[in-house]
């Protein structure tokens, strides 16, 4: 590093008088630069102001031509309506018109914007480009999978891939799978859609294409795949489940086993049904069921509302006679009274809670089930009215307790029976006393039920 202080000290007085002071020169240069910069900034600001004024005037003129900008909103609404119209498919079944909305991916395919290609490593330029696009998507969407492993399987000639390609040649997503024709199943190795394209239904539409293609071109009837926790939901929607019905001898040792993955299976439908027509097929099934229901029921009939209340708000009606269609539906006053009757008694909730706490108490184990006659031969000779917690639970569930008094009687019966049969030095006697004390404290803590202890 240069020592500036030392260098400046060796300069002679004559040299200082014979040259321009460096500090003064630098200061003048800085001030000159600042003045020049300020001038340039003012000019630039003036130019910006002029430009902004011109843009503002242009915008005002454009808005005036478009009706103040409201025309843009109208155009957007028209575009949305047109999009909805394109997505809606209608058909007629038995004189009734039905409609359903197609996925955006289906619409894009119909318009020729995307296509579904089946590719493998055949060394052609276009196939390799598609496979490379798939490889990049898999590596990005499956970060826990080794990149080299993904590359090896995607380019492997024993594997096939179905890719979603946006024209001319942009890969959006795809599935790489390995078919085992002689064993009638295929293993789905990778399945992913680009993160920017996951809201248009590409995943479901891709799987439907793959199923139809495999059934039409091979003997494959089943799909097997290992799904991670994030993919299980997707595969369930596509007809996969965790129950593997395919015999282990068919697939064991043939598919790749992934640690932490969940093995899932899809059994495909008969070839007479196209998966790509699944939305229409489901709607046809619904229409057929509704037709059968209409033959047996009048629930679909819409009757006019009652007009009597418009003139007389306090009018009294005979429901069966004055309300059209009510009697035909099978309604009766008895049914109405039965429906309004509470299913449980007013004390049910408290009794359920109290019985649950008694059952879970550490001292309750001797009273959980009836006394075994084979273990205690003379018990039922001494105790004429036996009771236990499981019997109380059964009676409570079957609405045998009309009042809390009856419930409390059975609970006390358990403790009294125990103390009558067992000596006061036994564990059974002590447990009965502990559990009864616990029950009394619980009842005492309830303001609504504490008075039962005084009875």
From Swiss-Prot:
Enzyme Commission designation = 2.3.1.48, 2.3.1.-
As recorded in UniProt, coiled-coil segments are: none
The main location is: nucleus
Signal peptide span per the entry?
Answer: none
What is catalyzed by this enzyme? L-lysyl-[protein] + acetyl-CoA = N(6)-acetyl-L-lysyl-[protein] + CoA + H(+); (2E)-butenoyl-CoA + L-lysyl-[protein] = N(6)-(2E)-butenoyl-L-lysyl-[protein] + CoA + H(+)
Q: Which GO terms describe its biological process?
A: negative regulation of induction of conjugation with cellular fusion; positive regulation of transcription by RNA polymerase II; transcription initiation-coupled chromatin remodeling
Q: Which UniProt keywords apply?
A: Activator, Acyltransferase, Bromodomain, Chromatin regulator, Nucleus, Transcription, Transcription regulation, Transferase
Q: Which residues form the N-acetyltransferase domain?
A: 114-269
- Where acetyl-CoA binds, per the record, is at 191-193, 198-204, 230-233
Q: Which residues form the Bromo domain?
A: 342-446
Supply the SMART domains for this chain.
Answer: BROMO
Q: Which family would the database say this protein is a member of?
A: Belongs to the acetyltransferase family. GCN5 subfamily.
Can you name this protein?
Histone acetyltransferase GCN5
Species annotation:
Debaryomyces hansenii (strain ATCC 36239 / CBS 767 / BCRC 21394 / JCM 1990 / NBRC 0083 / IGC 2968)
State the organism's lineage.
Answer: Eukaryota, Fungi, Dikarya, Ascomycota, Saccharomycotina
